[in-house]
Design a protein with these regions (language model features):
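Residue-level recognition of hydrophobic positions within alpha-helical transmembrane segments
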Residues: 8-10, 22, 302
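Extracellular juxtamembrane-to-transmembrane boundary of type I single-pass membrane glycoproteins
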Residues: 288-303
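Juxtamembrane cytosolic interface motif at the C-terminal end of transmembrane helices
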Residues: 313-323
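Cytoplasmic C-terminal tails of single-pass
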Residues: 324-328
Length: 328
């Protein structure tokens, strides 16, 4: 299935989602980023967004999730399963330190993916489709790496196997789902009149008034990971009574856990949006400079040839005039 056809389906399905850290969170990150793109950067990435999406970067932000979902992409989801491990990394339980040589073997983790696709996006040896996919993956993975549990513990698979109850609901859930969906759902319902656009405007204002976004480096992927790991150990895995969560017991989380963590979600969405914009703007500049570098030697040669022709022509005219004067 082509990207254009798949995204025509997904974009029109997107209105069915009410809330969710998945599609809504990624959409917000992309939307925040696009609001800060340089004109030239926006024009460049628009070349890779299917025409029916009208340049909407947020509409492609969940593509890497959709292509490995058999319900959304039933015909060839299995062709993309190789990309699953690129969405996250895991560290030893309560080790609280990411070590790439231990936790990202052969670059098969989210840090390796961020490095790879930022390079492929501006690699002249990659064709249009490869660069388009690189953009889609990059937009998504910048969002993923700012979700703390995408840098969670190996023993419970990033919170998937930590089971319990959230806000006294009768059906059990897992910690990953609490972070993917539940906290953001309640946050938007309570504080933004169930309106995602109001939430976006709030995040946008937050983004321009946060000290922690000053002097950001556009591709400090290790720093982004270290931040998520720190939040996992200091905040995400602690229940309402600051007792560690694990797979040995069911959790019961409520108001205290919610109030402690919704500001962190706001912060991570804002950081992801800002950093994605910085990354794309810088890659656009790097791409522009790369376009001229391979032609520089040729340009110098041509310039030298033209200069030599000019010198010989001027010399020829001078000699002709001098000979003509001698004859007279």
């Amino acid at each position: 299935m082509s990207i254009s056809i798949l995204y025509f389906i997904l974009f029109n399905q997107e209105i069915l989602y009410v809330f969710g850290w998945g599609p809504i969170g990624h959409s917000l990150v992309a939307r925040l980023a696009q609001s800060q793109l340089d004109f030239s950067t926006n024009s460049w990435i628009n070349n890779y967004i299917p025409l029916n999406l009208s340049g909407n970067l947020s509409a492609i932000a969940s593509w890497p999730d959709e292509i490995i979902d058999p319900n959304k992409n039933p015909f060839d989801y299995n062709k993309w399963l190789w990309s699953h491990e690129l969405h996250f990394l895991t560290i030893p339980d309560w080790n609280c330190k990411y070590i790439s040589r231990r936790d990202c073997l052969n670059n098969r983790c989210i840090e390796g993916a961020l490095k790879n696709y930022s390079e492929r996006l501006i690699d002249n040896n990659c064709d249009y489709i490869q660069q388009q996919q690189a953009l889609f993956f990059l937009v998504h993975f910048v969002g993923d790496v700012h979700q703390p549990l995408h840098c969670g513990f190996k023993g419970d698979f990033g919170g998937h196997n930590v089971i319990g109850f959230f806000f006294n609901k009768t059906n059990s859930t897992n910690l990953r789902y609490v972070w993917n969906v539940e906290i953001m759902n309640i946050h938007i319902n309570r504080h933004f009149q169930s309106d995602v656009n109001l939430y976006y405007e709030y995040l946008k204002s937050l983004m321009f008034n946060q000290y922690f976004l000053i002097n950001e480096t556009y591709n400090d992927y290790k720093k982004w990971i270290d931040e998520s790991v720190s939040y996992v150990c200091k905040q995400v895995y602690l229940d309402d009574n600051n007792i560690k969560l694990d797979i040995s017991r069911n959790f019961v989380l409520g108001e205290q856990y919610f109030n402690r963590n919704w500001p962190l979600i706001d912060q991570r969405l804002v950081q992801a949006g800002r950093r994605l914009a910085l990354l794309l703007n810088q890659l656009s500049k790097n791409r522009s400079s790369k376009k001229f570098l391979p032609d520089t030697p040729l340009f110098i040669i041509i310039l030298c040839i033209e200069l030599a022709i000019g010198i010989f022509a001027a010399l020829g005219v001078h000699l002709y005039k001098r000979n003509k004067q001698h004859r007279i």
